[in-house]
């Protein structure tokens, strides 16, 4: 049985980062809503309480009874989690005189405390809170302070319960990983035995037990997630897996043909379906982004339903859903941020059970699994691409001509990123493509005046988008070389009929999302 850390999510934007940091310690963890602790799970070895956008004294704040957890498992509260435990045990939490956001340094701390083992003196930590603990209960002790925060960290005396008002999961906390290692490995006893290989071994065994001799259909998109899911399932159930790759007409240039070839080389049983005319017809005149996503999602259901009925006795629908898909589709408060193609809707109409073997993995973990499975590097390192394809990179309504323009521009941009060689941090040669997390071109709903030769033009503008990230939860715009952008801009304007202006998007996430729609 795989031991795990449970992270109780109180709605923090950095909850996913906590999970990533724990998994980087080769220890498995799961995030569950703050009020859904799995009390009957014998594999739990420790609990982390996340931050929250609420104040602990707000009537609407998320609150939970920890009496059945405390004393049974080691607990680490982060930010709100720390404030919540202090407040509910009789401590005081009040609005800070000055809001604490950004860098701070540990001015005093108990170096003998197991949570702070090997944490350096004056180590930088990252603060992000508007409230602060002003008094702790009698059975609590302060174990760290900063210049402005007297109670930066505490421990409940004689208990394996700690709280920190800073964020060890954030990169800017210099010894944050060490602190988390102290908790996960030394205090909770984590064996650090979770890896891509162990995930494959466990998941294949679970899939065999779950699926038995049932037949499964899986929707391939050409992306990393569905491809790795397919190879993993193929390893578990072989010929009982049938993959369906639908061309909705909004794939990248030549993608349908190239991806089908890749899948055949992997030994997958794949059916390719050209449904482009159906999608173009149903999307005609539709401009609103969410409507476009819904139409494409429904279109996939229709095509899948038709193809699945041609296969006898199919019982399961498999998808390449990963963690960020689930988090962006539904927040802890139930507010829809953006509908994801992979989340919701499909199994209900098709009357199939749902299988999502990668649902609890982050993107980089999916790639590690793909490498462990022996998949070719060009498939594993492909940039993320939205399920609705170029439809959400065309602002406004969709037409075959707009798709043609965007395909041509995108092909020039992506190939340019692949061809432009640079040195990585270790001095090894790589390409710009492998230095960015995701890139693409957006066709803007505007036209602008230009001059080509001696003639005035009035043609479309496109925006280039490239971001750096590790998990898609946050992202920064990529600082591409000016020489590269000048070349790509020139190539697009000269080679793509209908475009006379190229812009570059320098928005980070948040506040923007990676995709424009």
Swiss-Prot record:
Domain Glutamine amidotransferase type-1 per the UniProt entry, residue ranges: 4-193
Catalytic EC class: ligase
Keyword DNA repair in annotation: no
Catalytic activity: XMP + L-glutamine + ATP + H2O = GMP + L-glutamate + AMP + diphosphate + 2 H(+)
Name of the coding gene: guaA
Pathway: Purine metabolism; GMP biosynthesis; GMP from XMP (L-Gln route): step 1/1
Ranges of residues in domain GMPS ATP-PPase: 194-382
The protein's name: GMP synthase [glutamine-hydrolyzing]
Catalytic machinery residues: 79 (nucleophile), 167, 169
Keyword Repeat: no
Organism in which the protein naturally occurs: Phocaeicola vulgatus (strain ATCC 8482 / DSM 1447 / JCM 5826 / CCUG 4940 / NBRC 14291 / NCTC 11154)
UniProt cross-references to HAMAP family, sorted A to Z: GMP_synthase
A single GO molecular function term of this UniProt record: ATP binding
One cellular component (GO) term of this entry: cytosol
Primary role: Catalyzes the synthesis of GMP from XMP.
Biological classification of the source: Bacteria, Pseudomonadati, Bacteroidota, Bacteroidia, Bacteroidales
Self-association and partners: Homodimer.
InterPro entries reported in the protein's UniProt record: Class_I_gatase-like, GATASE, GMP_synth_C, GMP_synth_GATase, GMP_synthase, GMPS_ATP_PPase_dom, NAD/GMP_synthase, Rossmann-like_a/b/a_fold
Keyword annotations of the record: ATP-binding, Glutamine amidotransferase, GMP biosynthesis, Ligase, Nucleotide-binding, Purine biosynthesis
Residues where ATP binds: 221-227
Lineage: superkingdom: Bacteria
């Amino acid at each position: 049985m795989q031991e795990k850390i449970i992270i109780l999510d109180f709605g923090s934007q950095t909850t996913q980062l906590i999970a990533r940091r724990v998994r980087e310690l080769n220890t498995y963890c799961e995030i569950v809503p703050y009020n859904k602790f799995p009390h009957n799970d014998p594999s739990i070895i420790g609990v982390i309480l996340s931050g929250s956008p609420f104040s602990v004294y707000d009537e609407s704040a998320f609150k939970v009874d920890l009496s059945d957890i405390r004393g049974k498992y080691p607990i680490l509260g982060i930010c709100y989690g720390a404030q919540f435990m202090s407040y509910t045990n009789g401590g005081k939490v009040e609005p800070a005189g000055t809001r604490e956001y950004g860098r701070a340094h540990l001015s005093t701390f108990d170096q003998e405390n197991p949570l702070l083992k090997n944490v350096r003196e004056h180590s930088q930590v990252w603060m992000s809170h508007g409230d602060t603990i002003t008094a702790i209960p009698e059975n609590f002790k302060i174990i760290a302070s900063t210049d402005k925060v007297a109670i930066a960290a505490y421990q409940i005396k004689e208990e394996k319960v700690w709280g920190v008002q800073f964020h060890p999961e954030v990169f800017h906390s210099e010894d944050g990983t060490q602190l988390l290692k102290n908790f996960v490995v030394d205090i909770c006893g984590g064996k650090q035995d979770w890896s891509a290989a162990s995930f494959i071994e466990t998941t294949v065994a679970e899939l065999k037990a779950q699926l038995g001799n049932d037949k499964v259909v899986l929707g391939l998109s050409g992306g990393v997630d569905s491809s790795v899911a397919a190879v993993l399932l193929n390893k578990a159930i072989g010929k009982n897996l049938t993959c369906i790759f639908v061309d909705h007409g909004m794939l990248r240039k030549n993608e349908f043909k190239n991806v089908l070839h890749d899948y055949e080389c992997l030994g997958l049983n794949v059916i390719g379906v050209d449904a482009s005319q159906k999608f173009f017809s149903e999307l005609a005149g539709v401009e609103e982004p969410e409507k476009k996503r819904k139409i494409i999602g429904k279109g996939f259901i229709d095509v899948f339903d038709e193809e699945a009925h041609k296969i006898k006795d199919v019982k399961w629908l498999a998808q390449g859903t990963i963690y960020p898909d689930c988090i962006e589709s539904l927040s802890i408060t139930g507010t829809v941020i953006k509908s994801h193609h992979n989340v919701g809707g499909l199994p209900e109409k098709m009357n199939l059970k749902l299988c999502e073997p990668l649902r609890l993995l982050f993107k980089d973990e999916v790639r590690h699994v793909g490498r462990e499975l022996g998949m070719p590097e060009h498939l594993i390192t492909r940039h993320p691409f939205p399920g609705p394809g170029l439809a959400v990179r065309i602002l406004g309504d969709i037409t075959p001509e707009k798709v043609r323009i965007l395909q041509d521009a995108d092909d020039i941009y992506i190939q340019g990123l692949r061809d432009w060689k640079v040195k990585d941090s270790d001095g090894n040669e790589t390409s710009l493509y492998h230095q960015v997390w995701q890139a693409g071109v957006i066709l803007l709903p505007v036209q602008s005046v230009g001059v080509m030769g001696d003639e005035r033009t009035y043609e479309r503008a496109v925006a280039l988008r490239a971001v750096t990230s590790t998990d898609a939860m946050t992202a920064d715009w990529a600082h591409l070389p000016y020489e590269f952008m000048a070349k790509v801009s020139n190539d697009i304007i000269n080679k793509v009929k209908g475009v006379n202006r190229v812009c570059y998007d320098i928005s980070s996430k948040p506040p923007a999302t990676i995709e424009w729609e």
